Design a protein with these regions (language model features):
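Structural alpha-helical scaffold elements that stabilize or flank donor/cofactor-binding regions
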Residues: 3-5
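PLD/PLD-like phosphodiesterase catalytic module centered on the HKD motif
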Residues: 7-13, 17-171
């Protein structure tokens, strides 16, 4: 969250499933409101429907905040990385979802090497350009009511399942 709050020019997060905590989501909104270019590179193909739909339940809010969403089309995405201003990066096994962060006890490294961060940012930009489809606010707004309802129900189910664990208060 500190890296997102310190961002000045660009934030790029890449992961299959994006179900962030309210704190992370609000930090992304604050960054976008400051004029930071915030981009998400997310799974385009459905591997696990519940997580995929729950991630998509946030698209309306994210797009409305000016956050760009790119869905990876080349195959299943297993990257879990992020770069802030080419000076801070995270790399590891955790998606930004409650199961990765709380239940599965996955972890990410924090890297502050400018060369590494710049290279990672360039690689992500290449993937976005070559292997992704950008989701636009206008295209998303035209999705059917059933489409949107399925995503909202999936998100609520994820958080309901989380509430059955001892980790609910931590997310």
């Amino acid at each position: 969250i500190h890296a997102l709050d310190a961002a000045r020019t660009e934030v790029v997060l890449a992961m299959a499933y994006f179900i962030p905590s309210h704190n992370i989501l609000n930090a992304l909104f604050r960054a976008a409101a400051r004029g930071v270019r915030v981009q998400l590179l997310l799974q385009g193909r459905i591997e696990y429907r519940l997580q995929h739909y729950a991630s998509q339940s946030l698209y309306h809010q994210l797009l409305g905040a000016g956050i760009r969403i790119h869905e990876y089309q080349k195959g299943f995405m297993h990257a879990k990385v992020g770069v802030v201003d080419s000076v801070w990066a995270t790399l590891g096994s955790a998606n930004l979802d409650p199961f990765s962060l709380l239940v599965a006890r996955e972890a990410n490294l924090i890297i502050r090497d400018h060369t590494f961060c710049t290279d990672l940012a360039q690689r992500l930009a290449h993937e976005i350009k070559m292997n992704c489809h950008e989701v636009t606010a206008s295209a998303w707004a035209q999705k059917s009511g059933l489409h949107r309802t399925a995503r909202i129900i999936s998100a609520r189910l994820i958080f309901r399942l989380l509430s059955l664990t001892r980790y609910a208060d931590n997310y």
